[in-house]
Curated annotation (Swiss-Prot):
It comes from Dictyostelium discoideum. GO terms for biological process: cytoplasmic translation; translational elongation. This is Large ribosomal subunit protein P1. Gene3D superfamilies: 1.10.10.1410. It comes from the Eukaryota. One of its GO terms (cellular component) is cytosolic large ribosomal subunit. The lineage of its organism: Eukaryota, Amoebozoa, Evosea, Eumycetozoa, Dictyostelia. One of its GO terms (molecular function) is structural constituent of ribosome.
């Protein structure tokens, strides 16, 4: 794992720890946790994640994360594979409708004839 990803994850986990304990998520508190864990990160990460995590309802996010992830992927694949036959069926239906309209015109049964 790259150093940047490790730093990002460390800040995210720090934010989750603070939230779990009911403590307000701030850059200083994230820095304190990281120092206690002997993890060094770029100086901009704690402030960035503190501002980002302060805007998010973390418990709700965690509850909804598992419910839509895997289930959302399967229907997309199924819909994509089903879309091609459905499109072909629509084209065939339109062609048949056009032929029916033409046959009505040939019989002289138009409304304004």
């Amino acid at each position: 794992m790259s150093e940047i990803k490790t730093e990002e994850l460390a800040c995210i986990y720090s934010g989750l720890l603070l939230q779990d304990d009911g403590i307000e998520i701030t850059a200083d508190k994230i820095k304190t946790l990281l120092e206690a864990a002997n993890i060094t990160v770029a100086s901009h990460w704690p402030g960035l994640y503190a501002r980002s995590l302060a805007k998010v309802n973390i418990p709700e996010l965690l509850l909804n994360a598992g419910s839509s992830g895997a289930a959302g992927a399967a229907p997309v694949a199924a819909a994509t594979s089903a879309a091609a036959p459905a499109a072909a069926a629509k084209k065939e239906t339109k062609k048949e409708e056009v032929k029916k309209e033409e046959s009505d015109d040939d019989m002289g049964m138009g409304l304004f004839d």
